[in-house]
């Protein structure tokens, strides 16, 4: 018997009061392609984020800065095809919402129209970003905010380092999250900040907080697909947890395949097709 179709989370489902009453934090994971999206939806996550982290983990860049709007749309389309019934958020990449509200609106609408996403995400809480959040939200484009460590502008923050550990940084992070809520953001990502600060922010906001490296008291958590599955071997990141070791398994599987090819063990008879002798004889 076929299982019933999954019911996609709606925007009202993602509000803070409903989360606290249910007691179950939201689960978000990144995905960048069709198979990854299928895995995430089949696992029953609440939200999928097509993050501009694809620049690092998929495209091989050193940062997210080179990622373009075309990149995000291309990958967003693939993810939506793989996860038609999961709430989908797509990052607006660096430079697409910094030149004014008109440009930002045009880019956000393109993302929604061309990918089928349910919302967009943007980093920061400067007055310019808040203006964009305000206009998009008022015009029917749901926006997820992002404070704390912001990879798009990490160089200006002193690199990829924990934020909110001193008085000024903690206050900026708290005030930025509150300002994003007031501008209309339906949720705010808290990245790489002390757990106690994240708890305070979560208590202050009436919209959901989604943590990554921000402790257990956020209203939800997000991890990068490649970090979660251990697709890259090496030291485990502090803000992530490795639930599998697929990088090692992939390397070993490819090495096994290569060894069998070189030993003429693959393809075997089980992987080959046959033909009748009389058909072959006519070719000589």
Curated annotation (Swiss-Prot):
Pathway(s) of this molecule: Cofactor biosynthesis; (R)-pantothenate biosynthesis; (R)-pantoate from 3-methyl-2-oxobutanoate: step 1/2
Cofactor binding, per record: Binds 1 Mg(2+) ion per subunit.
Compartmental location: Cytoplasm
E.C. numbers: 2.1.2.11
Gene Ontology biological-process annotations: pantothenate biosynthetic process
Matching SUPFAM superfamilies: Phosphoenolpyruvate/pyruvate domain
Cofactor(s) listed: Mg(2+)
Disulfide bonds: none
Entry GO terms, CC: cytoplasm
Major location category of this protein: cytoplasm
Active-site residues per Swiss-Prot or TrEMBL entry: 191 (proton acceptor)
Binding residues for 3-methyl-2-oxobutanoate: 52-53, 91, 121
Annotated InterPro entries: Pantoate_hydroxy_MeTrfase, Pyrv/PenolPyrv_kinase-like_dom, Pyrv_kinase-like_dom_sf
Binding site for Mg(2+): 52, 91, 123
GO terms of molecular function: 3-methyl-2-oxobutanoate hydroxymethyltransferase activity; magnesium ion binding
Keywords for the protein's UniProt record, in alphabetical order: Cytoplasm, Magnesium, Metal-binding, Pantothenate biosynthesis, Transferase
Subunit structure of this chain's protein: Homodecamer; pentamer of dimers.
Function: Catalyzes the reversible reaction in which hydroxymethyl group from 5,10-methylenetetrahydrofolate is transferred onto alpha-ketoisovalerate to form ketopantoate.
Name listed for the protein in its UniProt record: 3-methyl-2-oxobutanoate hydroxymethyltransferase
Species annotation: Deinococcus radiodurans (strain ATCC 13939 / DSM 20539 / JCM 16871 / CCUG 27074 / LMG 4051 / NBRC 15346 / NCIMB 9279 / VKM B-1422 / R1)
Gene name of this polypeptide: panB
């Amino acid at each position: 018997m076929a299982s019933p179709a999954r019911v996609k989370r709606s925007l009202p489902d993602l509000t803070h009061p409903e989360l606290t009453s249910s007691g179950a934090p939201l689960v978000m994971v990144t995905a960048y392609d069709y198979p990854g999206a299928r895995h995430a939806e089949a696992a029953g996550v609440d939200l999928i984020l097509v993050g501009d982290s694809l620049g690092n983990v998929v495209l091989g860049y050193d940062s997210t800065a080179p990622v373009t709007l075309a990149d995000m749309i291309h990958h967003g389309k693939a993810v939506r095809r793989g996860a038609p019934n999961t709430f989908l958020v797509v990052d607006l990449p660096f430079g697409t919402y910094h030149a004014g509200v008109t440009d930002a609106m045009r880019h956000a609408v393109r993302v929604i129209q061309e990918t089928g996403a349910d919302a967009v995400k943007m980093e920061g809480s400067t007055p310019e970003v808040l203006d964009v959040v305000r206009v998009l939200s008022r015009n029917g484009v749901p926006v997820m905010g992002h404070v704390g460590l912001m990879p798009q502008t990490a160089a200006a923050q002193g690199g990829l380092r924990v934020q909110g550990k001193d008085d000024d940084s903690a206050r900026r992070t708290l005030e930025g999250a509150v300002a994003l809520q007031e501008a209309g953001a339906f949720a705010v990502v808290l990245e790489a900040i002390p757990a106690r600060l994240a708890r305070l922010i979560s208590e202050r906001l009436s919209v959901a907080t989604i943590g990554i490296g921000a402790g257990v008291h956020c209203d939800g958590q997000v991890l990068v697909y490649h970090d979660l599955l251990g697709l890259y071997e090496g030291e485990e990141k502090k803000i992530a947890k490795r639930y599998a070791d697929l990088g090692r398994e992939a390397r070993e599987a490819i090495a096994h395949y290569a060894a069998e090819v070189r030993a003429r063990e693959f393809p075997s008879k089980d992987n080959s097709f046959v033909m009748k002798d009389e058909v072959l004889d006519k070719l000589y």
